[in-house]
């Protein structure tokens, strides 16, 4: 297998650039460039010299012999000065060694998986950790890399395999006196309890999707109620056009924010009203769809001239807020909050309420749940097979056992214990080249 190398420290130029290598030629490459093989897992400082004798850089080198490395192969890292010319010259030198080439995206992690250093859940968690932009996403990724999910899924799979063993024993030795016909009957309660655990885990994963995908907060209201001013103040910059003319916003505008360490997608929509303008009508239909899909709807009213807006059916929480508080006296309308998006009067209170809403929703989520849609889908497939086995007790026992086998295979595919070769290219292509 080729020895692979890549920059693993990010964009250049930088203070330091880390070049990672993995494969059977690492010892030869390191010895040639350093003039010696450094002590394992100790930083070695010295000059790096090309094979033609030219100076490359003064650098730190660390050697990780197999199997005690990230990939399970011989690995090394060169910590160079992070100039583009320095790094490019060093990469060119590495490419001159026989059997050495630039790594493909995710190839280091893929080799770690193939060598049993990572399972698929941990690999996906690692990819999520690299991509994490908020504290909640970081915690979600750490859950995947910790191995706790893997332990849970393997435990469930082991239970299914043990149950199948009882059933198959009855099938294979039904005429033996020491194998009673009621053995398999005793396990179906265990199967039902396992199915309940899986369903609860799936429901937790669907609730927790907001940690990865973000909260969807939609701003709606009548034209000229100040929706775009609210959008701009929340975004901290002008992203929406604000004028006295009604109907300025024709399409939905989206801004990504972080509130309380949680990802939030804020959407400003076209004002709801009767209109003959075809473009504006389309904008209003788009707004209604966003309301249906929202986690929170902020229904904005002009406090001097509050116009009622009729929203489509939605499962989202709806906040009625009064805007333009700087122009009008506090009134008795049932506003949740009153503020001025233009001047910022009482807007801090509104921001704190938004943050509290997000944190409250997160507090309802448990500590262990599927972190990715792939995992969630395979869990649903496993539940479907278990339900087929439990609910159709008139089926031949061998068919019911087959449904349980398929369920355990779906659980095995989550961790990669069952052949998932067709998925590996998709999963590891999400990584950067140096990971």
Curated annotation (Swiss-Prot):
(6S)-5-formyl-5,6,7,8-tetrahydrofolate binds at residues 20, 77, 117, 435. It comes from the Bacteria. One of its GO terms (biological process) is tRNA wobble uridine modification. Pfam families: MMR_HSR1, MnmE_helical, TrmE_N. Its EC number is 3.6.-.-. Mg(2+) binds at residues 228, 249. GO terms for cellular component: cytoplasm. Binds 1 potassium ion per subunit. GTP binds at residues 224-229, 243-249, 268-271. Its cofactor is K(+). Its main location: cytoplasm. Keywords: Cytoplasm, GTP-binding, Hydrolase, Magnesium, Metal-binding, Nucleotide-binding, Potassium, tRNA processing. GO terms for molecular function: GTP binding; GTPase activity; metal ion binding. The keyword Isomerase does not apply. Residues 214-359 form the TrmE-type G domain. It is found in: Cytoplasm. Homodimer. Heterotetramer of two MnmE and two MnmG subunits. HAMAP family: GTPase_MnmE. Exhibits a very high intrinsic GTPase hydrolysis rate. Involved in the addition of a carboxymethylaminomethyl (cmnm) group at the wobble position (U34) of certain tRNAs, forming tRNA-cmnm(5)s(2)U34. This is tRNA modification GTPase MnmE.
